[in-house]
UniProtKB/Swiss-Prot annotation:
Keyword Cytoplasm: yes
Protein name as it appears in the record: Serine/threonine-protein phosphatase 2A 55 kDa regulatory subunit B delta isoform
UniProt KW keywords: Cell cycle, Cell division, Cytoplasm, Mitosis, Repeat, WD repeat
Function: Substrate-recognition subunit of protein phosphatase 2A (PP2A) that plays a key role in cell cycle by controlling mitosis entry and exit. The activity of PP2A complexes containing ppp2r2d (PR55-delta) fluctuate during the cell cycle: the activity is high in interphase and low in mitosis. During mitosis, activity of PP2A is inhibited via interaction with phosphorylated ensa and arpp19 inhibitors. PP2A complexes containing ppp2r2d (PR55-delta) also regulate the activity of TGF-beta/Activin/Nodal signaling by restricting receptor activity.
Subunit architecture: PP2A consists of a common heterodimeric core enzyme, composed of a 36 kDa catalytic subunit (subunit C) and a 65 kDa constant regulatory subunit (PR65 or subunit A), that associates with a variety of regulatory subunits. Proteins that associate with the core dimer include three families of regulatory subunits B (the R2/B/PR55/B55, R3/B''/PR72/PR130/PR59 and R5/B'/B56 families), the 48 kDa variable regulatory subunit, viral proteins, and cell signaling molecules. Interacts with ensa (when phosphorylated at 'Ser-67') and arpp19 (when phosphorylated at 'Ser-67'), leading to inhibit PP2A activity.
GO BP terms in the entry: cell division; exit from mitosis; mitotic cell cycle; regulation of chromosome segregation
Gene from which the chain derives: ppp2r2d
Amino acid sequence: MAGVGGGNDFQWCFSQVKGAIDEDVAEADIISTVEFNCSGELLATGDKGGRVVIFQREQENKSRPHSRGEYNVYSTFQSHEPEFDYLKSLEIEEKINKIRWLPQQNAANFLLSTNDKTIKLWKISERDKRVEGYNLKDDDGRLRDPFRITSLRVPILKPMDLMVEASPRRIFANAHTYHINSISVNSDHQTYLSADDLRVNLWHLEITDRSFNIVDIKPANMEELTEVITAAEFHPHHCHMFVYSSSKGTIRLCDMRDAALCDRHSKFFEEPEDPSSRSFFSEIISSISDVKFSHSGRYMMTRDYLSVKVWDLNMESRPVETYQVHEYLRSKLCSLYENDCIFDKFECCWNGSDSSIMTGSYNNFFRMFDRNTRRDITLEASRESSKPRATLKPRKVCTGGKRKKDEINVDSLDFNKKILHTAWHPTDNIIAVAATNNLYIFQDKVN
């Protein structure tokens, strides 16, 4: 069966897997975010241990024609450390919640990383030369005796082994009372937003000691709280527009030209609920876990527990497309509630041409949907299919009756194995899928 990816028929094949194969995975090693940079040449992951690992794409060469989708470690650094809030007697985890790249302006790369409370701007730069021949100190850094200096030297640059440095340039702190769930860089390349459960703040990349509160849904009496903010993102082209989603399954589009505080939205997107299908779990499964604008800016995609929806910004009443991710779990909601899986936050992503979308599921399955043909495919990130250039076989889940050879029964799904974080290369058919502590990279195999 052909893959889903936009345009020509092709199959997905294995390229690489990063991370240890251990059965007992340390909590700190679990990947918590995955993000390509604007060119797709760099791929960053963050984990629950506060580390950021950046991979760089290998250049194609004639001796290894299949290396175009391969990424190797470029830089690793500790972004966040565990902290303790003494005023509230709360531990602040080091877990990286989100990474967002800034568009590249010069030889260096910049990215934002955040944990629950603190956002940091990192500069990733290369050094392949060092200065030698100082007058006041030796090459090893020791100060020279000024009485022994008899001649003036002109320092020179000497080549050295390539060294990649990650240095923190800005720290944006003390602006969020609740846990940060989103950061999004604006198209003006000067500002970005950060969102927590009840507020959205606007920052300037050069100013760390203050931010502007642009959304505040906190009620005067917290007992009247009925919803929380779950995700927020800037429009890719209009720097005055952004959206934020809620735990009630609604999306609000805001225009910062209307007012400084965007409590009154410009557009309100909500799908009417079918009263006949209402249940105890309806509100939980309608909570939106991710919202992403298409690259064109015409559409936005939202992910709730069971489905992905595509909305036209010009139509607020209902989504233009709805894709069922794992409808077979609807009958299992009670047990998923008991083991807390129903609160899992799945992300979603677009391909470069906005013609296909991808999101994760359980059992290390991930789903792709072709918006033009309406075809969909379920693939699995597993060590069994991790032979170089091995074609991924489509997987199917059966809900009862006789199980075919290649199918897996819904009762056999492993809910501890889940694909929450995925990323699609901005131009090529290369995808990155985080499965617990492993990062799988797949690419197309053109027929």
